[in-house]
Amino acid sequence: HLLEAAEEDLEIVGGEVRVVGAPQLAVTLGELARVLKGAPGYGFPQGMDPGLEASATFRVDQLAYSNACHVVEVEVDIETGGVRILRYIALQDAGRRVNPLIVEGQVHGGIAHGVGNALLEWMGYDAGGQPVTTTFADYLLPTATDLPNFETLYKESPSPHNPLGVKGVGEVGVIPAAAAVISAIEDALSPFAVRISQMPVMPHELVELIAKGPTG
């Protein structure tokens, strides 16, 4: 309509819709979107409403699973039960990274969440079943001072099950983190045969577990 040409005589090249064989007769995709939105001064053929809208359904028959390996080094004060994370290394395979910066942010946030699950985020209830950790004064979250600099590595093995070769990235940050931290604590306290069966593990609980150990 804008170029006064039939649909079959149009092509999209370099961000423009243009008439085949007459590249000077063209309109940019941005201008086309502005017009279709209903820009003043443009009329539409009868039966055509302003708007730029399309819908489609994409179905994935097979899921794309992510993989990760997290390694943590911790220091535990056996007198206070305090835990300090000295080093955190995370190797991720989230398929093709379309936007590496967003992937890095997702992984960092996931690790922080997992550390919180392992050490801080306790949800408590009173005898009547009412929550007692209802503010951030009671429900503790990790801050920057609780976390080390994360060392992140990436192996891109594109998924064969979708056109972009992508996999989920949120899960590979958060799910291994808590297990890696707890495993590191158990390893650090191996002389005391400490086994941790619930999260988060609080300092006073670690002191009690150490005291129950063979060398406690």
What are the residue ranges of the model-derived segments?
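C-terminal catalytic domains of large/alpha subunits in multi-subunit enzymes
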Residues: H1-G216
